[in-house]
């Protein structure tokens, strides 16, 4: 039994650009939110703030994992796209 894979390199490239844009936007938004939260920390100091900070730090940890995994997938997809382009141009 042979298996076949159908790949559209243009669609892969579009997706790569979309995920890169998403990651850039996510990082920018995260940096702004970090700054705002640090500024607020001087005036919001109760149990709810501590709970929020714990949840927020966990979210940042998960987002960092997603970012790292996405970077790995981008590398793979870039290689796959290039192989498909090479194959299609031969």
Indicate where each model-derived feature is located:
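N-terminal secretion-targeting helices of virulence/extracellular proteins
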Residues: 1-90
């Amino acid at each position: 039994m042979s298996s076949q894979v159908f790949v559209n390199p243009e669609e892969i490239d579009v997706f790569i650009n979309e995920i890169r844009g998403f990651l850039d936007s996510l990082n920018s938004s995260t940096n702004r939110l970090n700054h705002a939260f640090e500024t607020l920390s001087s005036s919001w100091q109760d149990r709810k703030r501590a709970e929020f900070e714990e949840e927020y730090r966990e979210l940042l940890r998960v987002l960092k994992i997603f970012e790292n995994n996405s970077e790995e997938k981008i590398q793979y997809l870039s290689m796959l796209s290039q192989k498909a382009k090479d194959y299609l141009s031969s």
